[in-house]
């Protein structure tokens, strides 16, 4: 995994972390929000490991998908809204599963280099 790939894929995790911190600091109306040190630590660790999680999921998925899969299915780009929603769901899944899959991605990255 290159530094460019890491920086490109850490942006989604940083965005979610900044939203969480913003919601903690703007909690003046008395709404209960998950404010704890352990939750903040988990979110920061997930942010750091999110690119590794994405790398591990892509590595595993591309071992099962053939190279010509996207060339043969030209109609995959006909539904841009559905494609965008699926992409956001994929990024959220990578962030939620960042700790276990991130450690796996870190192991795969070290093994391949």
Swiss-Prot record:
Keywords in alphabetical order: Bacteriocin immunity, Plasmid
Gene Ontology BP annotations: bacteriocin immunity
Signal peptide interval: none
Any matching Pfam family: Microcin
Any GO MF annotation of the entry: toxic substance binding
Task of the protein: This protein is able to protect a cell, which harbors the plasmid ColE1 encoding colicin E1, against colicin E1.
Protein name (record): Colicin-E1 immunity protein
Lineage: Bacteria, Pseudomonadati, Pseudomonadota, Gammaproteobacteria, Enterobacterales
């Amino acid at each position: 995994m290159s530094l460019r790939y890491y920086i490109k894929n850490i942006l989604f995790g940083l965005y979610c972390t900044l939203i969480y911190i913003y919601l903690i600091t703007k909690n003046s109306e008395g709404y209960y929000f998950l404010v704890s040190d352990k939750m903040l630590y988990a979110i920061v660790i997930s942010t750091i490991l999110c690119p590794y999680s994405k790398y591990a999921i892509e590595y595993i998925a591309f071992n099962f998908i053939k190279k010509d899969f996207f060339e043969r299915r030209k109609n995959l780009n006909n539904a841009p809204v559905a494609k965008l929603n699926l992409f956001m769901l994929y990024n959220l899944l990578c962030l939620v599963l960042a700790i276990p899959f991130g450690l796996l991605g870190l192991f795969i990255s070290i093994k391949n280099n």
